[in-house]
Amino acid sequence: MIVSMIQFRIELPPLESIKDKRRIVSSLKEKLSNKFPLSVAEVDLQDSMRYAQIGAALVTNSKTFGESLMHKVLAFVENNCEGVLQDAEIFSETF
């Protein structure tokens, strides 16, 4: 069993409240879950109004497929996010 994962940080546009951040993050998580077979969560920086840290994972039997899908996720985020992608890390673990 292989778990492929991506973690990325987004710099958000200027926000007036944490509710605005939740709206942006929830929208992105929903878009990712609808488009890709992933589990998605905000994994860090929940109290930050400037940044969001998102993680997503996929259980697969192919490291190549999993990492290829994560690169597609990254491209999707770059083109469909209300913020600016700051950094991303893609990796896989075999269990």
What are these regions (language model features)?
Residues 59-95:
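C-terminal structural segments of small proteins and small subunits
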Residues 3, 41-61, 93-95:
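Short, charge-patterned binding micro-sites
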Residues 38-44, 86-89:
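A short linear hydrophobic-aromatic micro-motif
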Residues 12-17, 60-62:
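A generic structural motif
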Residues 4-12:
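Short glycine-/aliphatic-rich beta-strand segments at the starts of folded cytosolic domains
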Residues 5, 26, 31-41, 66-67:
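Amphipathic alpha-helical assembly/interaction segments
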Residues 21:
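C-terminal binding/interaction regions
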Residues 36, 52, 84-86:
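Residue-level signal for beta-strand positions within conserved beta-sheet cores that form or flank
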